[in-house]
Amino acid sequence: MDTHRADASQRSQAPAARPRHAVHSIDHYALEVPDLAVAERFLDAFGLTVARTPECLEVYAADQRCWARFYEGERKRLAYLSFSCFEGDFAGIRQQLAASGATLVEDPRYGDESGVWFFDPDGNLVQVKIGPKTSPSSKSPARLEGAPGGQRGAVVRSQVQRVLPRRLSHVLLFTPSVQRALDFYRDALGLRLSDRSDDVIAFTHAPYGSDHHLLALVKSSARGWHHAAWDVADVNEVGQGASQMAKAGYTQGWGTGRHVLGSNYFFYVLDPWGSFCEYSADIDYIPAGQAWPAGDFAAEDSLYQWGPDVPEYFVRNTEA
């Protein structure tokens, strides 16, 4: 654990028994929102590519992969969350779902019926299907900062390029019970605890090589969608993304700062529905097979190392 990571009040976390089978990636997430035109403007300003289909908006990052779908609905909510697994894990995951008491869904509302669909303990619709690993298999390269003596270290403002996120990094869900959700995603889908802060927030990773968190869970009075995080090259792109969104009229958010759990640089942009999109750079990476020393951190050491004060609306669940 490096000196950037708060550890003075870290309490050891005994590992739970690990299931044999696990997902390896988030394939994509899907939201329902009241107005797709509003969603398209926001996502385009953020630096993502949006394609309209007869059913929804498909959202692509710079890697030209569809990471999200937006459907029209009465209000903003998570439509579903889709995970991918290797073929050799699929049957075992189905058995783990049955053992965990998951409610299977035979006829999901959405077009893709592949894999297995079910509700998690909070009532979120989830899909697991066989697919290629799309989570990184090594730490995403970050640009080196600084310039040698005798050279300029920054381009002029007029030459700053538009920030285009490289890929989806992770998502965070509100849950009435962090421990219950953590137990389910561990026992049913094989996700492993990375770090936590009591029963307030927990971060999980996939065992096949994963960012520090693939799925995060935070305490609320109800289920809900908090944010999706998108990987960018460095802290400059985090700050440039904040400026890019402010210029487009999206001025509310939190950052720029640096997290403790995950260590990533961040800026969160408030979206039109009260949740967030995050620019994220240089997040910790957990290689396949590595035993990560999961910690239980005090509240004051669990959120950020530096940055502006947290706005009140950052922890508001607009779906509660």
UniProtKB/Swiss-Prot annotation:
Pfam family, one: Glyoxalase
Stored InterPro entries: Glyas_Bleomycin-R_OHBP_Dase, Glyas_Fos-R_dOase_dom, GlyoxalaseI/FosfomycinResist, VOC, Xdiol_ring_cleave_dOase_1/2
A GO MF label: catechol 2,3-dioxygenase activity
SUPFAM superfamilies named among the record's database cross-references: Glyoxalase/Bleomycin resistance protein/Dihydroxybiphenyl dioxygenase
Keyword Iron tagged: yes
Catalyzed reaction equations: catechol + O2 = (2Z,4E)-2-hydroxy-6-oxohexa-2,4-dienoate + H(+)
UniProt keyword terms in alphabetical order: Aromatic hydrocarbons catabolism, Dioxygenase, Iron, Metal-binding, Oxidoreductase, Repeat
Single biological process term from Gene Ontology: catabolic process
Region annotation Disordered: where it falls in the sequence: 1-21, 131-153
Family of this protein: Belongs to the extradiol ring-cleavage dioxygenase family.
Name of the molecule in the record: Metapyrocatechase 2
Name of the coding gene: mcpII
